[in-house]
Amino acid sequence: MFKKLFGKAKEVDKNIKIYAPLTGEYVKIEDIPDPVFAQKMMGEGFGINPTEGEVVSPIEGKVDNVFPTKHAVGLKAENGLELLVHIGLDTVQLDGKGFEVLVESGDDIKIGDPLIRFDLEYINNNAKSIISPIIITNSDQTESIHIEDVQAVVKGETQVIDVTVS
């Protein structure tokens, strides 16, 4: 009985693979045309220059935060890793126009689950850039981050980063 009450908690895997949330061309974080992302002020990560307008979950976990302007979503893995998927640059100023959110905060997600659909042409014509940053916002709490050597990526299929959480 005491073992049930005071037994060890379920072991959480410290390693996590992050898949591409968008289909398109991989962009090194340093090449994202925004210093906040390029200088890693928000954390380590990468960008994607998308060729289609759907964002899927790059990890298994929960939706932590859906931005009211629909241009970004925060995700959290079971091991505590926090990820921001931000569609385009300066897209907050579009105030949700061109975006359709498919999830809510608290939703359970699996790799490949649709999160947001967006009008690629509209965003491309009305935002600073369509390049979309994917950032580990708590990368200071990781032991290691290995970025794969990729170029063309497919949403929910191409592994981009392998992370070990501290």
UniProtKB/Swiss-Prot annotation:
Entry-linked Pfam families: PTS_EIIA_1 (PF00358)
Cofactor, how bound (note): Binds 1 zinc ion per glycerol kinase EIIA-Glc dimer. The zinc ion is important for dimerization.
Subcellular compartments: Cytoplasm
Marked site positions, Important for phospho-donor activity: H71
InterPro entries, alphabetized: Dup_hybrid_motif, PTS_EIIA_1_perm, PTS_EIIA_component
Active-site residue list: H86 (tele-phosphohistidine intermediate)
Cofactor (UniProt): Zn(2+)
One of the GO biological process terms: phosphoenolpyruvate-dependent sugar phosphotransferase system
PTS EIIA type-1 domain location: 34-138
Residue positions binding Zn(2+): H71, H86
Keyword terms of this UniProt record: Cytoplasm, Kinase, Metal-binding, Phosphoprotein, Phosphotransferase system, Sugar transport, Transferase, Transport, Zinc
Recorded GO MF terms: kinase activity; metal ion binding
Positions where Phosphohistidine occurs in the chain: H86
Any Gene Ontology CC annotation: cytoplasm
Self-association and partners: Heterodimer with glycerol kinase (glpk).
NCBIfam families named in the record: PTBA
Domain notes: The EIIA domain is phosphorylated by phospho-HPr on a histidyl residue. Then, it transfers the phosphoryl group to the EIIB domain.
Described function: The phosphoenolpyruvate-dependent sugar phosphotransferase system (sugar PTS), a major carbohydrate active transport system, catalyzes the phosphorylation of incoming sugar substrates concomitantly with their translocation across the cell membrane. The enzyme II complex composed of PtsG and Crr is involved in glucose transport.
Name this protein carries in UniProt: PTS system glucose-specific EIIA component
Lineage of origin: Bacteria, Bacillati, Bacillota, Bacilli, Bacillales
